[in-house]
Every structure is written in C-alpha cells, then in structure tokens.
Amino acid sequence: MISESLLLVFLIVFISASLLKLLFVRENKPKAHLKNPPSPPAIPIIGHLHLLKPLIHHSFRDLSLRYGPLLSLRIGSVKFIVASTPSLAQEFLKTNELTYSSRKMNMAINMVTYHNATFAFAPYDTYWKFMKKLSTTELLGNKTLGHFLPIRTREVHDIIQFLFHKSKAQESVNLTEALLSLSNNVISQMMLSIKSSGTDSQAEQARTLVREVTQIFGEFNVSDFLGFCKNLDLQGFRKRALDIHKRYDALLEKIISDREELRRKSKVDGCEDGDDEKVKDFLDILLDVAEQKECEVQLTRNHVKSLILDYFTAATDTTAISVEWTIAELFNNPKVLKKAQEEVDRVTGNTQLVCEADIPNLPYIHAIIKETMRLHPPIPMIMRKGIEDCVVNGNMIPKGSIVCVNIWAMGRDPNIWKNPLEFKPERFLEGEGSAIDTKGHHFELLPFGSGRRGCPGMPLAMRELPTIIGALIQCFEWKMLGSQGEILDHGRSLISMDERPGLTAPRANDLIGIPVARLNPTPFRQM
C-alpha cells in the first residue's frame, strides 16, 4: 500500500511536471497566436494549383495585387510564401538571411545535378561555403577574369565580324541563337578550353544540354508537389531527366578523362607546373583542388561535373537573355538607342571597338542595363527554403516554406517606380535612383540576388554586358523582323515583349533581324 507521504510526493512531482510541460510548450510556441499571411481559398489536395498560369511570376503578381504583398499559397503539399516589396525582400534575404539560405531541389534538379553534389542548389553548409569561397576567389576572382579577357574580347570581335558579313549580304540573323553561341563560347573556353565550332563539337553538345537543363528545371512537375504522385512519372520528367544526365555525364567524363591524361603526361615529362604564362581554365583549377588530400572539402568527380553544369547553365542563358532583352527594348525606344550610341561614339571616337576598359566611361549604358534588368530580370524570382519557423511583419512563416521574392513584380510596381512600364534609363542617373546598384544592397533591384546566396557570376556578367551591348549598338542598326517575317517600321512597329516559361525569363520568340552597318570599316582593336 502506498504511504500518504509517498502519494504526496507523487502528486507534487506530477503537478510540477504538468506545469513545466505547460510552461515549456508556451515558451516554445510563442508564435502560435500570430497570424498567417493572407491566402486565397484553396481546393482539397491541389491547394492553389488551379490559380497558376504557365508564367508563374505573373500569376504570383496578380494574386499579390488582390491579397497583398505577403501571400501564402499551397501548391499540392508544398507551402509557398510570396513576397513582393523591397521591405519584405530585405526581411527574408537580409534580416533573416540564415533562415533562408537554402534552396528546394525538385526531382529533375536532383537527378541531373548528381544528387547532393550540386553547388547552386546545395544547402547552406560546409560544402556550400567552401564552393562559394572557391568560386569568388579562384574561379571568378578578378585575377582569373583578367586572365580570360582576351577570350571575351575575341568572342565580341567574332560576333561583330559575323554580323558585318551578314550586313554586307543583307541577310537576316537569328540574334537569339547568335548571342547564345557567344555566351556559350566564352564560358566553355573559360571552363574547359573548348569552343563551339560545328554541330559535333563538345561545346555545341554542352550548349544543347544546357538549354534542355534550363527548360526541364523550370517546368512544372506534378510529382514534386503531390505526395501520392511522388513515385509516378506522370509527365515523363524522370525519363527526360535521366536521359539528360546520361548524355551530360558521358560528355563530361570524356572531357575530364582527356584532361587527366594530359595532366599525367605533363607530369611524366616534368612539366607539372606548366608554363608560367599558361592560364588555367576552371577544370584545371577544380582538378587541382580535388587532388589536394588535406583540403577542407574533398571534391569528388561528381562535384567537379556538377559545378561545371552549374556554371554552364547560369552563364550561357542569363547573359544572352539580358543582351537580347536590351536590344529589343532599344529597338522599341529609338531615342534611348540614339543617346546610347552617342555615348559610345564619344568614348571610342569610332576608331576602335568598345571594350571592357571603356566600361567606367559608359554610365548611360550601365543605366540601360539596370533598366532592362528592372523590367526583365534574367531570374524573375528569388526562391529560398526556410529551415526554421520565422516571424516576418507579424506573420508566422512555418519551417519548410518556400519563399519566393518576386523581383519581376517589384520592377513593375508603381508604388516603387514612377511610370514603371516606361523604359527610362535616366531614372538611374537622376536623384535617388543614381545610387541604386545591382549588387544586392538595394532591394528594389535584385537581378543577381542578395547576400550569401547572391550570384557569384555577377562580376563576369557586368564585364560582358556593357561590352557586348556597346559593340552591337556601336556597329549596327537593325531591321527587325516580325512574327510573319515582315520588316518592322523602326519607331512605329514594336517588337513583341512576351515571355515564355522556364527557369529563366526569356523572350517568347527568337529575335531576328537584318544588321545594317553604322560604321564602315568596322573598328577593331588589336588583340
């Protein structure tokens, strides 16, 4: 029989434990009383899937206009939080940066990028930090970019010569494809020392694969959002992703094996240090790091392959897309084009082709690039995955939510920009706008993201964009063709500015036109 004293002790312990549990729960759930962001009515199982159109960032903007700048959506079983103001962007990307420093991987990304070997979609951990440091100091540092200046210069010269020959023949050019070839040639030479020349070349294969990768990464796969469909390949994504992965892996395996054999031969010949003048490409740098046994992170073969894919994907599409949008906007805004040409003519004297050394003297070209990226950011939304519960503007944001900062919508918001749909580069040269840059410090303009996960390729992009755009408008006018092949009346007929879906935000239709030489002969610098 239990004594009264023992029963009393038991009761005291029970009551104390209950009180402690109650206090613990209350202490650890201080956010339970907080409101959730507004949300449209949902349908069981699919959530808000029925409200989305192919251009997701457009759909998110339309819903935000109705329900507010902080919006909660459920796509199947996945919760999305849409943020559409600079202050909210700052909350997620700066104030709570560590909470939102990871990304969600879908099935296609996971399969194509060697599962956990990717850098672009890796969680914010030791591996990611190491790769970010390697990218910013070695792969895309000022010294490395300086070494590759002759490659970038030569590629700009090549496209100008190509367009000049087309101009003499009065032949049309698919500028979309030409710009993709240019950006692919630059990054493939920087990474692998190969250049696209003919349909059977390694760089050409890589370019084809990159376009397939960006397409499948940006497409909607129902299996990523509906749990009961996870193991069902209803849309054939798994089959496509596996095919892309196999072809890419075979291509990279051949390139890496050939390079390793060349490195072994150099060591046997006693040339392992190479010529002091020899510039190492990205692959050599990565293989050097992989061979370091005492390295902070041991790079595997899959790490090397995945990183090359990350950079091919990022550098090929986004640069070409930004130049293409810029040329389209300049055609539709002839006064802006004329002013830009006058600036380039003044700086170069039309005796030499614009080059990277001229960039500091081209403020209007810089303003044009900012204005293009305001209206047409190459990546329309910054997406982050929350690793813990967070409170933003008095709203409870649950752990695991996918936060989408809709930078495309912010660029067109009349509460942020005066006459937002007008293409007016002067807004970045006058008043407060003159202080706005693209480095992620000004949350109304985030074409390269912000903070730790900001795009490491920004220094390369901001060398290429002014030079390519400057050279194109310095050397040519354009007779642009419409959807039916008709020549558009410059100043009256406008190029369509429709978009198509994808990981990036490209134009819906290829940009095709007949180049008309402004300068004859075309000026070239000595290489």
Curated annotation (Swiss-Prot):
Molecular function, one GO term: oxidoreductase activity, acting on paired donors, with oxidation of a pair of donors resulting in the reduction of molecular oxygen to two molecules of water
Subcellular location: Membrane
Thermal properties: Optimum temperature is 25 degrees Celsius.
Pathway: Secondary metabolite biosynthesis; flavonoid biosynthesis
Sorted UniProt keywords: Flavonoid biosynthesis, Heme, Iron, Membrane, Metal-binding, Monooxygenase, Oxidoreductase, Transmembrane, Transmembrane helix
EC number, as in UniProt: 1.14.19.76
InterPro entries cross-referenced by the UniProt entry: Cyt_P450, Cyt_P450_CS, Cyt_P450_E_grp-I, Cyt_P450_sf
Family: Belongs to the cytochrome P450 family.
Protein name: Cytochrome P450 93B16
